[in-house]
From Swiss-Prot:
It catalyses: L-seryl-[protein] + ATP = O-phospho-L-seryl-[protein] + ADP + H(+); L-threonyl-[protein] + ATP = O-phospho-L-threonyl-[protein] + ADP + H(+). Residues 844-895 are annotated as: Disordered. Its EC number is 2.7.11.1. The lineage of its organism: Eukaryota, Viridiplantae, Streptophyta, Embryophyta, Tracheophyta. The modification Phosphoserine is found at S858, S866, S871, S874. Receptor-like protein kinase that mediates the female control of male gamete delivery during fertilization, including growth cessation of compatible pollen tubes ensuring a reproductive isolation barriers, by regulating MLO7 subcellular polarization upon pollen tube perception in the female gametophyte synergids. Required for cell elongation during vegetative growth, mostly in a brassinosteroids- (BR-) independent manner. Acts as an upstream regulator for the Rac/Rop-signaling pathway that controls ROS-mediated root hair development. Residues 469-895 are cytoplasmic. The keyword Cytoplasm does not apply. Residues 884-895 have a biased composition (Polar residues). Keywords: Abscisic acid signaling pathway, ATP-binding, Brassinosteroid signaling pathway, Cell membrane, Developmental protein, Ethylene signaling pathway, Fertilization, Glycoprotein, Kinase, Membrane, Nucleotide-binding, Phosphoprotein, Receptor, Serine/threonine-protein kinase, Signal, Transferase, Transmembrane, Transmembrane helix. The chain crosses the membrane at residues 448-468. Glycans are attached at N46, N124, N142, N171, N219, N269, N305, N330, N345, N410. This is Receptor-like protein kinase FERONIA. Residues 28-447 are extracellular.
């Protein structure tokens, strides 16, 4: 084949770029000298996991110090859809103490233990109760993987430790507890990897927050990683880390209150430059190229804190590592962005100025702090808050954070073991122990030896030939579709790969409690669907919608309940809506969005499989139902949950997503009454920064349809706000959005409720069940919020963030009044509620004299305030916990 000179030059250029890229990647990676991946209970052959890492079996392994007769190997009885096969489908089970011995060099090691609580060898998973020790250190004690998974709604658990090995041997002992008598221990996988000594501090510069004394972290200190977050960015999988195989997770699930701040991404022309003395393996480029700030409005920023809340074990000291990198090209000088860092309501850094630390933007920096939480039992909260420092009058009243790592430090007797979390609605999920695949492509973990340029050339040539061959096959039409005859996992690409995905904001808020990996969608065969629904038994019909019927089903041998939506060929909603639903939900994982498990497209069918929502729709509990009436606080919490889901759609994904069909039948309730937004068949990607709207054919549901959208056929996220305002009035009045049996002026709730509001008679159309159960302050705030949502002009409506904030505030007002013994009024005084004629100002409006909903406690607010005579500025406010101040809907059963 003749190649022109131009093509030859282009090929040569591509080759050089590939070699350069390979060299850069290898330079950024740490190369472990030891890497042991032990597949416990596995067969004789080695297996490869989803990150392309090879796991060796422990059967007849040299690492078995104890006799293999003292343990048994067993496969898991069942496999959750979210659980990878390697290393979780086999385990080694111990009924007496059992020791693994790993011959390794002296020095620091990452030790990761992998657990999938299931039935092994016929044993009950709840009877698994054991300790794990290494030398003088107790890593786990009285540990129940089953209880932990249930409490945190995880399918599987990863425990990561940092230990120091001396003497060339790492002995790890698993010991079943003495009680109950049938207790046993198990483990699915063990990872031992060498690491650089990157967390020690022996020079006296590390101090305890709130104290002047220094803290030493040396070889005698063992650590457990409890959180590792990529603030403002995506999840980062182990294969996309810097050779250390750490998992980094999205920070949004941990943000307190509605003050989410805004994600920032390094300017495209900015190169992240690690300073001399800072190894590039400290944190990936993707951590330093994304951040979260408070936003551009100084007035707002000065009235709240950007706050994260973490659940931790009491009785331990914690190492908190914060990662910083100025990502804005506009900030190049000292005193442009200065802020205060608080840890547990104590000042950790009075004047944090990233440029002062680094001398330039685009330069990574990290700083360590040690926190000693108050004494207590069980679990407590660790707070991290940022607030602008106005003392030196910086150019921007703002703050910035790129990454967070939190480690538990061993006690004086070598203990790292905390208590098992208690299942219940108050347990906060911790995704730092769940391995969730991301969209990033795996990169090689084997460092390229310096000087091996020929290896890079060969690699580049191989890649080039593969790409060329793939191109030729595509041209010839040689690609064959995968068979859809059996169930399998089909990757649905989210927003890109590798570093290009760094700015693509995917959230798994709450995603961490999902039953599925965030980037995989299961493909079911039609035979599986028929078996799950008992051949579409009509007695299993849960409901009928525009797309078709929804059936109750069971998959995976009856172990998992699901809802199965079967498309009706005669429905107006067809292939486009089917594809939209898959594309949208496969990209989104959030506590308040219904999870898509998979789909089926065989035999011209269009079938979607979702998580089962035990309590059905919100509407089923408001009117025309035999169900008991919902209490007011529960209605508020459901509205808050739905608002969180919509707020995430509008702001949390890479592009704004407009739902376009918000209504009470599309707000579903799980077994713990956690609200989840559903039905994305009509959803639309919203406008970019360069546009204010999307021109589209009008779609939606009558009674909820934004009149401005209907008139102008221009869709914005404010159309969802309008529809949600109707939902709020439905929750308050317990009547349909449209009721043609009523008088003409009362048919539309979106028109009748505002009319009653303006006339001061809204209390007269409130659900009679709620009379005497809503405090006047709460009623006023809720009514104002709903009213602003349904204003005629979209520009006058609040954002979903504002709506969420005000609903949280309304709930706070209700709870505060109840706790302080204030009475609730059957007849709310509507004369006190002044209609503002639509001239409402959002929290991004600098001219607003009052910041709607800026009420938090002292840990998320820059001001002291009180409600009902109780100060919220005090740490010890008569038991008024953060969960009492703001309903976070942090139910771990939410996914």
């Amino acid at each position: 084949m003749k190649i022109t000179e131009g093509r030859f030059r282009l090929s040569l250029l591509l080759l050089l770029l590939l070699i350069s890229a390979a060299t850069l990647i290898s330079a950024a990676d740490y190369s472990p000298t030891e890497k042991i991946l032990l597949n416990c209970g596995g067969g004789a052959s080695n297996l490869t996991d989803t990150d392309n890492r090879i796991w060796i079996s422990d059967v007849k392994s040299k690492f078995l110090s104890s006799s293999s007769e003292d343990s048994k190997t067993s496969p898991a009885l069942t496999q959750d859809p979210s659980v990878p096969e390697v290393p979780y489908m086999t385990a080694r089970v111990f009924r007496s103490p059992f020791t693994y011995t790993f011959p390794v060099a002296s020095g620091r090691k990452f030790v990761r233990l992998y657990f999938y609580p299931n039935s092994y060898d016929g044993l009950n998973a709840t009877n698994s109760l054991f300790s794990v020790s290494f030398g003088p250190y107790t890593l786990l004690k009285n540990f129940s993987a089953s209880q932990t998974a249930e409490a945190l709604t995880y399918a599987f658990i990863i425990k990561e430790f940092v230990v120091n090995v001396e003497g060339g041997t790492l002995n790890m002992t698993f010991t079943p507890e003495s009680a109950p008598s049938n207790a046993y221990a198990f483990v699915n996988g063990i990872e031992v990897t060498s690491m650089p000594d990157m967390y020690s501090s022996t020079d006296g510069t590390l101090t305890m927050v709130g104290s002047s004394g220094s803290v030493t972290i040396d070889n005698s200190t063992a650590l457990e990683n409890v959180y590792r977050l990529n603030v403002g960015g995506n999840d980062i999988s182990p294969s996309a880390d810097t050779g250390l195989y750490r998992s980094w997770y999205d920070d949004q699930p941990y943000i307190f209150g509605a003050g989410l701040g805004i994600p920032e991404t390094a300017d495209p022309n900015m190169t992240i430059k690690y300073p001399t003395g800072t190894p590039t393996y400290v944190a990936p480029v993707d951590v330093y190229s994304t951040a979260r700030s408070m936003g551009p409005t100084a007035q707002i920023n000065l009235n709240y804190n950007l706050t994260w809340i973490f659940s931790i074990d009491s009785g331990f000291t914690y190492l908190v590592r914060l990662h910083f990198c100025e990502v804005s090209s506009n900030i190049t000088k000292i005193n442009q962005r200065v802020f205060t860092i608080y840890l547990n309501n104590q000042t950790a850094e009075p004047e944090a100025d990233v440029i002062a630390w680094t001398s330039s933007n685009g330069v990574p920096f990290h700083k360590d702090y040690v926190v000693n939480p108050p004494e207590g039992n069980g679990q407590q909260d660790l707070w991290l808050a940022l607030h602008p420092n106005p003392v030196n009058k910086p150019e921007y009243y703002d703050s910035l954070l790129n990454g967070v790592e939190i480690f538990k430090m061993n006690t004086s007797d070598g203990n790292l073991a905390g208590t098992n979390p208690i299942p219940g609605p108050q347990v906060t999920a911790d995704p730092s122990k769940v391995l969730r695949p991301t969209t990033r492509k795996s990169k090689s973990n084997t460092a390229i030896i310096a000087g091996a340029a020929s290896g890079a050339v060969v690699l580049a040539l191989i890649i080039g030939f593969c790409v060329f061959g793939a191109y030729r096959r595509r041209k010839r039409g040689d690609y064959q579709p995968a068979s859809d005859a059996t169930s399998g996992w089909l990757p649905l690409s989210l927003y890109g790969n590798s570093h290009s995905a760094g700015s693509a904001k995917t959230n798994t808020t709450g995603s961490y409690a999902s039953s599925l990996p965030s980037n995989l969608c299961r493909h079911f065969s039609f035979a599986e669907i028929k078996a799950a629904t008992k051949n579409f038994d009509e007695s299993r019909v849960l409901g009928v919608g525009g797309f078709g019927k929804v059936y109750r089903g069971e998959i995976d041998g009856g172990t998992t309940k699901v809802a199965i939506k079967r498309g009706n060929p005669m429905s107006e909603q067809g292939v486009h809506e089917f594809q939209t639903e898959i594309e949208m939900l496969s990209k989104l994982r959030h506590r308040h969005l219904v999870s898509l498990i998979g789909y089926c497209e065989e035999n011209c069918e269009m079938i979607l499989v979702y998580d089962y929502m035990a309590h059905g729709t919100m509407r089923e509990h408001l009117y025309k139902t035999q169900n008991p009436s919902l209490p007011w606080k529960q209605r508020l919490e459901i509205c808050i949950g739905a608002a969180r889901g919509l707020h995430y759609l509008h702001t949390g994904a890479k592009h704004t997503i407009i739902h376009r069909d918000v209504k009470t039948t599309n707000i579903l309730l799980d077994e713990k009454w956690v609200a989840k937004v559903s039905d994305f068949g009509l959803s639309k990607t919203g406008p970019t920064l360069d546009h204010t709207h999307v021109s589209t054919v009008v779609k939606g549901s009558f009674g909820y349809l934004d009149p401005e959208y209907f008139r102008r056929q221009q869709l914005t996220e404010k159309s969802d706000v309008y529809s949600f305002g109707v939902v709020l009035f439905e929750a308050l009045c317990a009547r349909p959005a449209l009721n043609p049996t009523l008088a003409k002026e009362q048919v539309s709730l979106a028109e009748w409720a505002p009319y009653c509001y303006k006339k001061g008679m809204l209390d007269q159309i409130v659900d009679p069940y709620l009379k005497g159960k809503i405090t006047p302050e709460c009623f006023k705030k809720f009514a104002e919020t709903a009213m602003k949502c349904v204003l005629d002009q979209g520009i006058e409506r609040p954002s979903m963030g504002d709506v969420l904030w005000n609903l949280e505030f309304a709930l706070q007002l209700q709870e505060s009044a109840e706790e302080n013994g204030k009475g609730v009024c059957g007849d709310m005084d509507m004369d006190e509620i002044k209609y503002d004629d639509g001239n409402c100002k959002g929290k991004n409006d600098k001219s607003s004299d009052v910041y709607e909903g800026n009420v938090t406690d002292s840990r998320s607010s820059g001001i002291d305030m009180s409600i009902g005579g109780r100060s919220l500025a005090s740490e010890d406010s008569d038991g008024l916990t953060p969960s009492a101040v703001f309903s976070q809907i942090m139910n771990p059963k939410g996914r």
